[in-house]
Swiss-Prot record:
Protein name: Defensin D5
Lineage: Eukaryota, Viridiplantae, Streptophyta, Embryophyta, Tracheophyta
Main location: secreted
GO cellular component terms given for this protein: extracellular region
Tissue: Distributed in the epidermal cell layer of leaves and in the subepidermal layer region of stems. Not in roots.
Function: Antimicrobial peptide. Active against Fusarium spp., Gram-positive and Gram-negative bacterial pathogens.
Superkingdom field: Eukaryota
Organism this protein belongs to: Spinacia oleracea
GO biological process: defense response to bacterium; defense response to fungus; killing of cells of another organism
Recorded family membership: Belongs to the DEFL family. Group IV subfamily.
Keywords tagged on the record: Antibiotic, Antimicrobial, Cell wall, Fungicide, Plant defense, Secreted
Annotated compartments: Secreted, Cell wall
Length: 24
């Protein structure tokens, strides 16, 4: 995705988007 690994953790946690997988 267009989200960075670091941002993925934060975004994910907030928006619970596709990056949530990495955050978990």
């Amino acid at each position: 995705m267009f989200f960075s690994s670091k941002k993925c953790k934060t975004v994910x946690k907030t928006f619970r988007g596709p990056c949530v997988r990495n955050a978990n």
